Each structure stands twice: as C-alpha cells, then as structure tokens.
A protein has these predicted regions:
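Short, surface-exposed ligand-recognition loops at beta-strand->loop->(often short) alpha-helix junctions
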Residues: 20-27
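Short, flexible turn/loop "capping" segments at secondary-structure junctions
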Residues: 7-13, 55-56
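Hydrophobic packing within well-folded, soluble alpha/beta domains
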Residues: 17, 29, 49, 61-63, ...
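Hydrophobic/anchoring residues in structured secondary elements
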Residues: 51, 99-104
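An amphipathic, aromatic/His-enriched active-site/gating alpha helix that lines ligand/cofactor pockets
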Residues: 4, 8, 35, 41-47, ...
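Short, glycine- and small/hydrophobic-rich beta-strand elements in well-ordered beta-sheets
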Residues: 38-62
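Active-site-flanking beta-strand signature of metal-NTP-handling nucleotidyl enzymes
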Residues: 13-19
Length: 109
C-alpha cells in the first residue's frame, strides 16, 4: 500500500507501556488517561499518544506514545501534567506496569 502525498522518513522515540489496573479502578484510570492524553498531545515534541483497553481483559491497558526525540520524552516525564495525572493519580491504581522504549523509522508527513 502506498501512502498518498509526500512522505519523509526519520527516526522517532516510541514508548509502549503495558498496565495492569487494580480491580474496580478501570473507569478512573481511563478518565485520567483521557486527560493525560490531551495534555501530552500538545507537547512540542509529541507526535502521538494513544491508549487501548483490552477486549479480553478490561484491566489490561496499553499506552502507545511517540516523540520526535528521547529528550522530548524526558520533557514529558518532567511535566506538571505527568506528575499529577501519571505519577500521583494513575500509578497508585496500577497492579503492574511495564515500560518499553524503541527507536525506529516511521513515516512523517
């Protein structure tokens, strides 16, 4: 499949976080993630922030983040919205969390 329009390739910094939410906290975590996604998507170095709830196990959430550089991800981690929403409100509601980082090429328009 060919993408329409001009496409250039450049390396990005990608983060995938797998979360296991404490029983009964799914709705609260998803609400906080919605707020965190809105704030993160407008950061200068953010290319994308999406999250998904498993169909088979509603307590399993996958967060997919994409940044221009690793430094942009570091800026995100130091942001006020991440401190409040991520660290203070979401993390205590998780039974487990695994963060994976990747560098790779991807299409940019």
């Amino acid at each position: 499949m060919k993408l329409a329009g001009p496409v250039s390739r450049r390396s990005h910094f990608n983060v995938m976080t797998e979360c296991s939410v404490l029983p009964g906290c799914e709705t609260e975590v998803l609400g906080h993630l919605a707020e965190l996604a809105l704030a993160t998507r407008i950061e200068p170095g953010s290319i994308g922030y999406d999250y998904f709830q498993s169909v088979e196990n509603p307590r399993h959430i996958l967060i997919v983040e994409r940044y221009v550089t690793e430094a942009d991800f570091s800026v995100h981690l130091a942001s006020a919205h991440f401190a409040v929403l991520g660290k203070a409100l979401i993390n205590p509601l998780l039974a487990d969390r695994k963060v994976l980082t990747f560098k790779g090429d991807g299409p940019t328009r």
